[in-house]
Amino acid sequence: MAETARTAPAVDFVGGAVGYRFRTQAGRSHALLKATGLSPTRSLHVIDATAGLGRDAFLLASMGATVTLIERVPEVHALLADALEAARAESDELAAIIGRMTLLHGDARVLLPTLQADVITIDPMHPPRTKTALVKQEMRLLRDLVGADPDVGELLAAALSADCGRVVLKWPLRAAAPPASRKPSHQIAGKTVRYDVYVRPRAT
């Protein structure tokens, strides 16, 4: 058990950075909220196609979104399931947030054609940085567990073909985006990452 604790990433919605961001409401200005179009007056159903550590999904759910998380790696899915149940038991406030989160195990490329949502978010394993020390420990552990995401182009294509109004891809700020059937409608840039936003054209 001790070895697992040293080698597996921590998934925690109660303490750590996620808990702090929730308690202090520091996430209200997060670029992800702007990228998805989520606001206090606009509730959305969001599919997180690459759930990972669940941090983005929790942020969205804490701001009122209904979130479906898809994770294909069994070990990460199990970590997420345990963390969700721990948060549910922590307090009524957290239980209400977790109640808006549904965790699915599977390949998003297969599941997306069967689902409907307002927004699909994609945050794959990004290309390794040349300065690996800049990568936080939890992300290094996650990469060790899940490996790279060479099929991100296929996932983006599946998302763009799915029944949703908007697709949001989180990607390194200066890296070339995966090939796609169309260009992003717009981008929201941060210090090290950007959000490529694909808005489905309105039917005429």
UniProtKB/Swiss-Prot annotation:
Per the record, the major location class is cytoplasm
Listed GO CC annotations: cytoplasm
User: Which enzyme class?
Assistant: transferase
Its Gene Ontology molecular function terms? rRNA (guanine-N2-)-methyltransferase activity
Q: Which residues form a coiled coil?
A: none
The record lists S-adenosyl-L-methionine as bound by 55-56, 71-72, 123
InterPro entries per UniProt: 16SrRNA_methylTrfase_J, SAM-dependent_MTases_sf
Q: Which cysteines are joined by disulfide bonds?
A: none
Q: What is its EC number?
A: 2.1.1.242
One Pfam short name: SAM_MT
Going by the UniProt record, its keywords in alphabetical order are: Cytoplasm, Methyltransferase, rRNA processing, S-adenosyl-L-methionine, Transferase
Reactions catalysed, semicolon-separated, are: guanosine(1516) in 16S rRNA + S-adenosyl-L-methionine = N(2)-methylguanosine(1516) in 16S rRNA + S-adenosyl-L-homocysteine + H(+)
* Localisation: Cytoplasm
Source organism, top-level taxon: Bacteria
Function, as annotated, reads: Specifically methylates the guanosine in position 1516 of 16S rRNA.
Q: Which HAMAP family did the record assign? A: 16SrRNA_methyltr_J
Task: Please give the family membership noted in the entry.
Answer: Belongs to the methyltransferase superfamily. RsmJ family.
User: Could you tell me what this protein is called?
Assistant: Ribosomal RNA small subunit methyltransferase J
The species this protein was found in: Rhodopseudomonas palustris (strain TIE-1)
